[in-house]
A protein has these predicted regions:
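Eukaryotic phosphotyrosine signaling hubs
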Residues: 1-119
Length: 119
């Protein structure tokens, strides 16, 4: 069982068949469940380009990413877990669908050789 995080309600989703571990995946990518946009900006202040963290979104069951852009400013974007059984994620763009690492790089508009979770 995995917990889908939401500011309003925690929901559980059965993911037995695939073995996809939602919480483990999120924590590998700098999951910060208790912070908002302003706190994310403070945490990322002074970090290198494409450093990111994940957090709950204030919009329903969505998740949010906060990351440092090329210009040094922090950008925020949202994405959704569309298939908890297989760990398929999606951002608003039709080609931003796939595994969490792929969708993260798509949102940051960088390759897999760039970008690192905040430590």
């Amino acid at each position: 069982m995995a917990t889908l995080f939401n500011f309003q309600v925690s929901e559980t989703v059965e993911v037995k068949q695939s073995g996809y571990q939602l919480e483990s995946e999120l924590y590998q990518h700098a999951w910060r469940p208790g912070i908002n946009e302003t706190q994310a900006e403070k945490l990322l202040e002074g970090s290198s380009v494409y450093t990111y963290l994940l957090r709950p979104s204030v919009i329903g069951r969505k998740f949010a990413i906060s990351f440092v852009q090329l210009n040094g400013k922090v950008k925020h974007d949202t994405f959704t877990l569309v298939d908890p059984k297989y760990g398929i994620w999606r951002n608003g763009m039709e080609h931003h669908v796939g595994t969490l690492p792929k969708v993260i790089r798509d949102m940051m508009d960088c390759g897999f050789d760039k970008g690192a979770p905040l430590v």
